[in-house]
């Protein structure tokens, strides 16, 4: 086409208007937050197995 060079046309990317300078593409999936569970409950259960009174002392010390 131009000076004997071949021109390659790419389809336009779909963008969502948002913060300037940061484009969000519809095609790319958004990263998701990893699933985390509250580990404090497990800690209390483990403490009760070792020493039932220790879990109560820990609860008082941490304010739970």
From Swiss-Prot:
Cross-link (Isoglutamyl lysine isopeptide (Glu-Lys) (interchain with K-? in acceptor proteins)): 64
Domain of life from the UniProt record: Bacteria
Residue runs in coiled coils: none
InterPro entries given in the database record: UBact
Keywords per UniProt: Isopeptide bond, Ubl conjugation pathway
Chain ranges passing through the membrane: none
Location of the region described as Disordered in the Swiss-Prot/TrEMBL record: 1-64
Composition-biased stretches (Basic and acidic residues): 22-64
MF-aspect GO terms: protein tag activity
Protein's job: May function as a protein modifier covalently attached to lysine residues of substrate proteins. This may serve to target the modified proteins for degradation by proteasomes.
HAMAP family, per database record: UBact (MF_02133)
Family: Belongs to the ubiquitin-like protein UBact family.
Name of the featured protein: Prokaryotic ubiquitin-like protein UBact
Species the sequence originates in: Leptospirillum ferriphilum (strain ML-04)
């Amino acid at each position: 086409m131009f000076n004997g060079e071949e021109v390659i046309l790419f389809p336009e990317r779909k963008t969502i208007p948002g913060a300037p300078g940061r484009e969000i593409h519809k095609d790319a999936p958004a990263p998701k937050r990893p699933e985390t569970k509250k580990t404090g409950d497990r800690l209390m259960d483990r403490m009760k197995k070792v020493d039932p009174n220790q879990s109560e002392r820990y609860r008082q010390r941490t304010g739970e």
